[in-house]
Design a protein with these regions (language model features):
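Metal-dependent nuclease catalytic cores that hydrolyze phosphodiester bonds in DNA/RNA
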Residues: 1-91, 95, 199-209
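Short amphipathic alpha-helical surface micro-motifs
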Residues: 3-6, 41-46, 61, 110-111, ...
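A diffuse structural propensity rather than consistent per-protein peaks
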Residues: 4-7, 102, 143, 164
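Mg2+/Mn2+-dependent nuclease catalytic core
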Residues: 55-156
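Metal-dependent nuclease catalytic regions and adjoining charged, substrate-binding loops involved
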Residues: 68-69, 118-209
Length: 209
């Protein structure tokens, strides 16, 4: 059996809502809304750019990433390679919205850094996220706390996929309103259905840690 590599973008799905992650990556469900369509158009625009070099920095777009150690793979928007020795690799992720308090976007960036480190035999100390709504670039330190958080999510997301287990909806109802899978997920119905709680209790011993 071929080894499964978890898409790096899936980590952001999990961080936002584990149920959203499972619906997409376990049940293979997907619906597009304005936000996902707008984000897709933004990435298409970024990915279409040609590689270029300016002032000692090479800008590479649509870079394919892969980690055999962590079993993750994906494509990053932009990699800045600072050509002075030792070379510095600086990942940049583009997002349609604005900076967030939560680590959802930073986790995705950190996973990209983990792949770069393995592929290039280097250490990535920081990257950046460009937010289209605010036209701002947020520098993100790839520090120990973010690495630990990212690795925990990789491991837990893998366990959910292997178990074929779809968790309940997030308790944060505000996230549901912007989710493209709201109609498929039906979080309000799930929360009102007492049988769901019964099933959760029935299989409590089998829950994923």
């Amino acid at each position: 059996m071929d080894t499964y590599f978890l898409p790096i973008s899936a980590l952001q799905h999990y961080a936002y809502c584990p149920r959203q992650f499972a619906l997409i990556h376990v049940e293979q469900a997907w619906e597009e809304n304005y936000f996902t369509a707008d984000g897709r158009r933004l990435h298409e625009r970024v990915d279409d750019g040609e590689p270029e070099q300016r002032k000692g920095i090479r800008y590479e777009r649509s870079v394919l990433l892969r980690s055999e150690k962590h079993l993750i793979a994906g494509k990053m928007d932009l990699l800045e390679v600072h050509l002075e020795e030792p070379r510095k690799y600086f990942p940049v992720e583009y997002k349609r919205g604005k900076p967030k308090i939560e680590d959802w976007d930073r986790i995705q960036l950190c996973a990209q850094a983990l792949c770069i480190e393995e592929m290039q035999g280097t250490t990535v100390t920081e990257g950046a996220i460009w937010y289209w709504e605010t036209r701002q670039r947020e520098t993100v330190p790839i520090d120990a706390n973010l690495r630990t958080h990212t690795l925990d999510i990789i491991q837990t997301a893998y366990k959910i996929r292997q178990a074929g287990h779809t968790p309940p909806p997030t308790e944060n109802k505000r996230r549901c309103r912007a989710c493209s899978l709201k109609n498929l997920c039906q979080p309000d119905i799930y929360r009102q259905d007492r049988s769901a709680s019964y099933i959760e209790e029935l299989f409590a011993d089998e829950k994923i840690a």
